């Protein structure tokens, strides 16, 4: 049994999703968003760090997965996103959690079956996979998608008999 915390970082809204994995089955434990105030960036980064730290204390995950930074057209946005990721990753490493990262394409492929899926498709498939009564909010659905992607990737590595190592899917430790 393992508990996975997935995070979809953002400087304004950071989504999180927590699933429990037993064998090949995934169970929804919780999800939501860390909404930062419209203060200066350093304060927003602290809110992300504190929020992720609290979620870790609450759910006691065994593993942490986060979406990789994509190259945005706006360099300032990409830098802020990278800093938000950093705040979340530091919270995970402070709790001695292994950290894995996945691209948006990997996440969409794992959840929907195509790397070019729309947000609404990710929301729908997360709802179906986790048997939720309603589709989660977009940022929370993306974070749950990160956790689901990590679970599927981990299962694939186990099926390979350990031939692939953790670096294959961007794990830090």
Swiss-Prot record:
Coiled coil: none
Binding-site residues, Mg(2+) 1: 8, 139
UniProt cofactor note: Binds 2 Mg(2+) ion per subunit.
The protein's required cofactors: Mg(2+)
PROSITE patterns on file: RUVC
Classification via Gene3D superfamilies: Ribonuclease H-like superfamily/Ribonuclease H
Any Gene Ontology biological process: DNA recombination
Enzyme Commission numbers on file: 3.1.21.10
Binding site for Mg(2+) 2: 67
Active-site positions on this chain: 8, 67, 139
A GO CC term assigned to this protein in UniProt: Holliday junction resolvase complex
Catalytic activity reported: Endonucleolytic cleavage at a junction such as a reciprocal single-stranded crossover between two homologous DNA duplexes (Holliday junction)
Enzyme class: hydrolase
Sample GO molecular function, one term: magnesium ion binding
Pfam families the record matches: RuvC
Broad class of the protein's primary localization: cytoplasm
Family to which the UniProt record says this protein belongs: Belongs to the RuvC family.
Its biological purpose: The RuvA-RuvB-RuvC complex processes Holliday junction (HJ) DNA during genetic recombination and DNA repair. Endonuclease that resolves HJ intermediates. Cleaves cruciform DNA by making single-stranded nicks across the HJ at symmetrical positions within the homologous arms, yielding a 5'-phosphate and a 3'-hydroxyl group; requires a central core of homology in the junction. The consensus cleavage sequence is 5'-(A/T)TT(C/G)-3'. Cleavage occurs on the 3'-side of the TT dinucleotide at the point of strand exchange.
PANTHER family to which the protein is assigned, alphabetical: CROSSOVER JUNCTION ENDODEOXYRIBONUCLEASE RUVC
Subunit: Homodimer which binds Holliday junction (HJ) DNA. The HJ becomes 2-fold symmetrical on binding to RuvC with unstacked arms; it has a different conformation from HJ DNA in complex with RuvA. In the full resolvosome a probable DNA-RuvA(4)-RuvB(12)-RuvC(2) complex forms which resolves the HJ.
Alphabetized NCBIfam families for the sequence: PRK00039.2-1, ruvC
Protein name in the entry: Crossover junction endodeoxyribonuclease RuvC
Native species: Shewanella sediminis (strain HAW-EB3)
Lineage of producing organism: Bacteria, Pseudomonadati, Pseudomonadota, Gammaproteobacteria, Alteromonadales
Gene it is expressed from: ruvC
């Amino acid at each position: 049994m393992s508990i996975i915390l997935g995070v979809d970082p953002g400087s304004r809204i950071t989504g999180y999703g927590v699933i429990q994995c037993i064998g090949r089955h995934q169970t929804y434990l919780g999800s939501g968003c860390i909404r930062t105030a419209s203060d200066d960036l350093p304060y927003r980064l602290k809110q992300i760090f504190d929020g992720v730290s609290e979620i870790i204390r609450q759910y006691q995950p065994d593993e942490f997965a986060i979406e990789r930074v994509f190259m945005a057209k706006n360099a300032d946005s990409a830098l802020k996103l990278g800093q938000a990721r950093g705040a979340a990753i530091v919270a995970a490493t402070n709790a001695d959690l292994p950290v894995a990262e996945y691209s948006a394409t990997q996440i969409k492929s794992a959840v929907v079956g195509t790397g070019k899926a729309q947000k609404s498709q990710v929301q729908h498939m997360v709802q179906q996979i986790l048997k939720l009564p309603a589709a989660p909010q977009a940022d929370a659905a993306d974070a749950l998608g990160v956790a689901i992607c990590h679970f599927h990737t981990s299962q694939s590595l186990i099926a390979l008999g350990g031939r692939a190592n953790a670096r294959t899917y961007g794990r830090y430790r």
